[in-house]
A protein has these predicted regions:
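Positively charged n-region of N-terminal signal peptides that target proteins for export
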Residues: 1-4
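Bacterial N-terminal signal peptides
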Residues: 6-15
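Non-catalytic, conserved peripheral segments adjacent to functional cores
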Residues: 20-129, 138-139, 145-146, 156-159, ...
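Short, well-structured beta-strand segments enriched in hydrophobic/aromatic residues
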Residues: 149-151
């Protein structure tokens, strides 16, 4: 009798576990998209949800800007790449759930680096990646990961006139061999559909 009760409780517990969205599942990704009201980000790709901006202001080049703006950002298996773009503000990504994500950073001096946004610290991953303003960058969800939910802060705030999306042959030439992984083919993949003729 005790055996039957234990088995019954175990099966009930298993049913409960199976009914819950798993951390690596597409169901969990869809739940996050709906709950946080994320929408597809044009051109750059991925999912975006605007959280807000700071009430504190700064003046840069004679222009008043909020000290910071905050967003949710998400990559999924359907939209696994945040294509190459340049930002004037500092940009910091914090991994909330999922991942890992490879973060490609291209500095104004011609250096390139790849940092992995993730929770496996022993493997060299980091849960926070901070990118200085004036860099080019792209993010790609690692193979085997179903999604990555991040928060990002931009300082000063994001404005649409302080971003550039995509690049061309001259950019590819400049950053080719700037790191062992920076082949022309890999750089073109990071630019994706936003490759320009310039």
């Amino acid at each position: 009798m005790k055996y039957l009760i234990v088995v019954g409780l175990s099966l009930a517990g298993l049913t409960t576990v199976l009914a819950m969205p798993q951390a690596g599942s597409n169901a969990r990704a869809q739940e996050l998209i709906q709950t946080l009201k994320l929408t597809v980000l044009p051109k750059e790709s991925g999912y975006l949800g605007i959280i807000g901006r700071s009430s504190q202001m700064v003046t840069m080049d004679g222009r008043a800007l909020a000290v910071q703006s905050q967003n949710y950002y998400m990559l999924t298996r359907d939209l696994p790449i945040n294509y190459l773009h340049w930002l004037a503000p500092d940009d910091t990504h914090i991994l909330i759930e999922g991942g890992p994500v490879d973060y490609f950073i291209f500095h104004p001096d011609g250096r390139a680096e790849k940092v992995t946004l993730g929770m496996d610290l022993a493997a060299g991953q980091r849960p926070v990646v901070a990118v200085p303003g004036g860099c080019w960058k792209a993010l790609r969800l690692r193979a085997g990961a179903n999604y990555a939910l991040m928060a990002n802060t931009l300082s000063p705030e994001f404005t649409s006139d302080r971003v550039k999306i995509g690049a061309g042959a001259e950019w590819v030439k400049r950053y080719t061999n700037s790191a062992p992984w920076a082949t022309p083919e890999e750089l073109r993949k990071l630019i994706g559909p936003n490759f320009t003729a310039q």
